């Protein structure tokens, strides 16, 4: 609802955020998590609403779930919503999201992250079995590249990774580069399963370079890791 007398947009669920209203904090991080978690699937509809809002003289936004947003904030807020709803990355960087049973996949993920940092890449590493899943999903949408590292589990992927990918695909994850790392001592199949999970996703580039660890890193898988780091730093 728009009040043209006071130039206030009462935006219902839009432009909200998680967190307490009596705490001064940056709007963007919790607004990102709120948008991706609740509105992320409906980017096309949000783009349509933003086009309508562009024709209004808005000085204040009052949402149902968040602080009152004033005129000096609105340019940044609207720009963020445009980026999120168009499924564009906010930041040129890499999220390395892993699950690990005995620690070897975690070691490989951390080693990749460190090598990427030496190549000048901005990297965040998250353990999907221990972090806030909603925050991991938000970070995947924030960054331009995603590395998924997981053991093979019952011929599939480890459950936390499977849930994570499902959260991404049901929110129309797109316009990103994805790289895959798998671990399995005798029949590693996780990379193939993950690739299949993204089959219906639009505008995803899944790199050909894949790291296959059989138990723990050896010379062969370390060479694959170096090749993946090179590919990620160049794309």
Can you describe what each PLM-predicted range is?
Residues 1-25:
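Catalytic core of the metallo-beta-lactamase
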Residues 1-9, 50-53, 133-136:
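Short amphipathic alpha-helices and their capping/turn segments at secondary-structure boundaries
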Residues 2, 9, 93-97, 179:
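Conserved beta-strand elements of the Class I
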Residues 13, 98-101, 128, 182-183:
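Cofactor-binding loop segments of dinucleotide-utilizing enzymes, especially the Rossmann-like FAD-
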Residues 18-68, 111-126, 136-235:
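FMN-binding flavodoxin-like domain, especially the glycine-rich phosphate-binding loop
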Residues 62-90:
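Short N-terminal or domain-adjacent regulatory/targeting segments
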Residues 78-79, 126-131:
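Short gly/ser/thr-rich secondary-structure transition/capping motifs
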Residues 97-119:
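Short, charged N-terminal beta->alpha structural module
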């Amino acid at each position: 609802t728009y009040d043209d007398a006071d130039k206030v947009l009462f935006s219902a669920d839009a432009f909200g955020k998680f967190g307490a209203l009596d705490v001064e904090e940056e709007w963007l991080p919790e607004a990102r998590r709120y948008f991706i978690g609740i509105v992320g699937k409906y980017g096309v509809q949000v783009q349509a609403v933003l086009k309508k809002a562009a024709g209004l003289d808005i000085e204040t936004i009052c949402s149902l779930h968040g602080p009152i947003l004033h005129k000096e904030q609105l340019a940044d807020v609207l720009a963020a919503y445009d980026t999120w709803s168009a499924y564009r990355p906010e930041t040129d960087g890499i999220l390395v999201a892993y699950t690990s049973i005995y620690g070897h996949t975690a070691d490989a993920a951390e080693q990749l992250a460190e090598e990427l940092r030496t190549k000048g890449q901005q990297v965040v590493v998250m353990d999907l079995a221990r972090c806030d899943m909603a925050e991991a999903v938000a970070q995947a949408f924030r960054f331009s590249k995603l590395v998924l590292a997981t053991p093979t589990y019952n011929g599939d992927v480890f459950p936390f990774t499977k849930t994570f990918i499902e959260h991404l695909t049901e929110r129309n994850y797109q316009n990103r580069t994805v790289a895959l790392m798998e671990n399995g001592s005798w029949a590693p199949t996780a990379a193939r399963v993950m690739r299949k999970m993204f089959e219906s996703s639009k505008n995803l580039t899944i790199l050909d370079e894949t790291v296959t660890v059989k138990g723990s890193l050896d010379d062969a898988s370390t060479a694959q890791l170096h090749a993946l780091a090179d590919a990620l730093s160049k794309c």
